[in-house]
Amino acid sequence: MGESKQEHLIVGVSPFNPRFTPEWLSSAFQWGAERFNTVDVLHPGEISMSLLTSTGTPLGRAKRKVRQQCNRDMRNVEHALEISGIKLGRGKPVLISDYLQTQSYQCRRRSVIAEFQNNQIFQDACRAMSRAACQSRLRVTNVNIEPDIETAVKYIFDELPAYTHCSDLFEYETAALGYPTEWPIGKLIESGLTSLERDPNSSFIVIDFEKELIDD
């Protein structure tokens, strides 16, 4: 896939994650440019607020912190582009929150929620992943509370349509969403244990600078 350079790489960036430094992003952009026609960036934007509110941050403060973090991440992306000399295919990062209210995205999000309500395996996986994310956040903030998992899972509801239909979101014929680690919910979808499916024109890869491209 990457060797033919016929597809587009979309680098997923997570807020509040120290991995996504300008140096790491620069390496990811260069890595992608060697394997794909274009490189782009996908960022959650304001939907990451649910992670903060589910771990005790008041709504008003959560909004401010998310805006600040998003701006910080965008500066890191710009710095990484300067270091690498790469230009994004879409010209600028794409924020999931900018597309959340579109008809197609809302339709796919409703499908995710319906799966959560009707599939115990999917529900358990979403809750487990959300709890792990909350616990990681609580360790960073040194707060000892029980996280609100029902709020936290909304982050997955908001993100998943971008995972399953990244090519459509970016208006590319084909595209691969790249991230430095596997995504457990994505692996569950690929297992066939849910009714959710990934668009055949969209794929997921693990970005690993030391190994060959890993494609699931």
Curated annotation (Swiss-Prot):
Its EC number is 2.3.2.22. Belongs to the CDPS family. The record marks 17, 159 as: Could have a critical role in the catalytic mechanism. It uses activated amino acids in the form of aminoacyl-tRNAs (aa-tRNAs) as substrates to catalyze the ATP-independent formation of cyclodipeptides which are intermediates in diketopiperazine (DKP) biosynthetic pathways. Catalyzes the formation of cyclo(L-Leu-L-Leu) (cLL) from L-leucyl-tRNA(Leu). Can incorporate various nonpolar residues, such as L-leucine and L-methionine, into cyclodipeptides. InterPro entries: CDPS (IPR030903), CDPS_sf (IPR038622). This is Cyclo(L-leucyl-L-leucyl) synthase. The active site is at residue 14. GO terms for molecular function: aminoacyltransferase activity. Pfam families: CDPS. The record marks 65, 75, 155 as: Could be involved in aa-tRNA binding. Keywords: Transferase.
